[in-house]
Amino acid sequence: MSTAVQVDDVMRYRDSRFQTIAAKLLPTQYLVVDDDTALTTTLGSCVAACLRDPVLKIGGMNHFLLPEGQIGDGAPARYGSYAMELLINDMLKRGAHRKRIEAKVFGGANVLKGFTSNPVGTRNAEFVRQYLQAEHIPIIAEDLCGIHPRKVWFFATTGRVAVQRLPHAHEAEVAATESAVRARLSKAPVTGGVELFE
């Protein structure tokens, strides 16, 4: 039996598969850790970037819904550009060195029906690759695009990642969750800000 605890809006629980504490990230969330906590999330068309400074053994994960949004749009953390800045800046505040940061990226599946000409998943995957290239952060592993949702576990201290591709039976559930979050966030008030570091 596992007991879930909510800290900093991120739910933590005992993961029996890996015998460790896990922090489950939902869309728009990110978390940076320097311990054995497994960062985990479930992705459809969304993307998660797992960043790590291998010298400090500090790392973090984000989970974003869309590449970019309109200025003044509510809930900016749903957008990759903002979510990436939040994650990178938090790591830098904790002592990570920008030149040592490496990335592993996941998600971007095309699970949303009706988006065939310019699928959200493909746009998210293209965005994260371009963003990290522009920031000179190397991608050392990726599992992007395709048609299957994924569950991802990231262990920041070791850099290890486990990815489970979910069967088609989960597609509708993941797509419905992402659509519901998008609908809720489209009504959210504008909040937050980004502090940029050089």
Curated annotation (Swiss-Prot):
Annotated EC: 3.5.1.44
Record-level Gene Ontology MF annotations: protein-glutamine glutaminase activity
Reaction catalysis annotation: L-glutaminyl-[protein] + H2O = L-glutamyl-[protein] + NH4(+)
Alphabetized SUPFAM superfamilies for the sequence: CNF1/YfiH-like putative cysteine hydrolases (SSF64438)
One GO BP annotation of this record: chemotaxis
Keyword field: Chemotaxis, Hydrolase
Gene3D superfamilies recorded: 3.30.1330.200
UniProt key word Transcription: no
Pfam families: CheD (PF03975)
Hydrolase is among the record's keywords: yes
InterPro entries in the record: CheD-like_sf, Chemorcpt_Glu_NH3ase_CheD, Cytotoxic_necrot_fac-like_cat
Catalytic EC class: hydrolase
NCBIfam families: PRK13487.1
Task of the protein: Probably deamidates glutamine residues to glutamate on methyl-accepting chemotaxis receptors (MCPs), playing an important role in chemotaxis.
UniProt record similarity statement: Belongs to the CheD family.
Name recorded for this polypeptide: Probable chemoreceptor glutamine deamidase CheD
Species in which this protein is naturally found: Xanthomonas oryzae pv. oryzae (strain KACC10331 / KXO85)
